């Protein structure tokens, strides 16, 4: 298909001529009102002046019509936008929430109160047991439903702006960032989907730094296998999470429903640390419980030292630069792999 412009050159020529005619009509009217000589000249040559004026009016009608159409379109857009952003004048129950007067809504379909995308409340409102001043409506895939690639089940997700820390499903969420909940069983049940944690959360005996993000996550592999993890915690940037005396930075922890740590990866040692007889330098990568490692060495950690640095065994001395050491928390060494093998 050969692309063609929406408006041809002829259209713009006609539009330009019509615009000049409209300007001429306006200037002529102004001159007739302000200057007596112009009025006398118009009366002296009434027939010719009237014909020219009429011709200019007809010629200018095209641009006048275009302006009128544009103004009407703009008015329609403003009207539709206003209909998409109503403010409640009385209390209404929407999305299972009692919304007070003054609530400002954003709708995806004008006039359809069931198509809410956002809501801003004049004061804190109880949203499924959580005090919130605003919400955004979305969807999330239900990873607890039976897997069906042709028809993935979805859940209604509400992203809430809260007024202070809130404890949900055992996690204390902060208010510096929105938290997200999902509605299950026809909105009879609400569960936490994700939030940034406040102070006071603990995992495996360690304090999770405030600002870390917790989210619902179940690891699924390409072959269809699914792990038993239920939560994922991404430790706050530049903060340290202490796990079994290991000072971990950048850790991504995978937990089961009871918050037992099943696996973590992408972690590095924030400072030098020792396990059994081996001392590892800061920056050493630490992995636990990932697929492949857990089958061959259940419960073991894998340490990979940074390039040009090495771990030191107090009995045998330095271990080769960049080597990987598979070691139990008790200190038992299962294997040492040279280089940076996976």
Per-region residue spans from a language model:
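Glycine/tyrosine- and acidic-biased, solvent-exposed loop/turn segments at the edges of beta-strands
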Residues: 16-19, 65-342
